[in-house]
Regions:
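Extended amphipathic alpha-helical heptad-repeat regions
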Residues: 5-159
Length: 159
């Protein structure tokens, strides 16, 4: 009798252990699904924020008198300063003071244009970051959908 009772007790223990293991597995799968979903939500929010920031910077740059027009003017000024310097440097009997002044003007124009180029590069970087965030958000959303589908197939729906 003892051995039958031990067998039954062992079988019940194994069944209870299996039930607990199944519950833990289901909970783990549910947790994975929720984590993926939360990551997707966060990614989408970050993508929206990055897109808004990039759009704002781009719109500001495109305004009249904005970064794009300033950069265009600075590049024209830089080109004119370069021509004036070269003309002064190539003159016969050119005054060293005139050459020095033209070189100073050229350096100032170049520095102004470089500063504006750096600002424009920052706007382009914001746009690239927003694009990358949108791409990442799309991947995270797909992963979340895949996890949800796996959970529903394995466990017959969401609790």
């Amino acid at each position: 009798m003892g051995s039958i009772q031990n067998s039954i007790t062992g079988a019940l223990g194994a069944a209870a252990g299996a039930a607990v293991a199944i519950k833990h597995t289901k909970d783990s799968d549910f947790s994975k699904m929720n984590s993926a979903d939360n990551s997707a939500i966060i990614s989408r929010n970050q993508a929206r924020a990055a897109t808004a920031e990039a759009n704002e910077a781009t719109n500001e740059a495109k305004k009249d008198g904005g970064l794009i027009s300033q950069l265009s003017e600075a590049e024209v000024t830089e080109g004119e300063a370069k021509k004036a310097f070269e003309k002064a440097a190539n003159r016969k009997n050119g005054s060293p003071i005139t050459i020095l002044n033209k070189m100073t003007e050229l350096k100032a124009a170049k520095k102004a244009a470089d500063t504006l180029r750096d600002k424009y590069k920052a706007v382009e970087d914001l746009q690239a970051r927003a694009t990358e965030q949108r791409r990442y958000a799309a991947k995270a959303t797909q992963i979340a959908l895949d996890e949800k589908t796996k959970y529903e197939k394995r466990w017959g729906g969401i609790r």
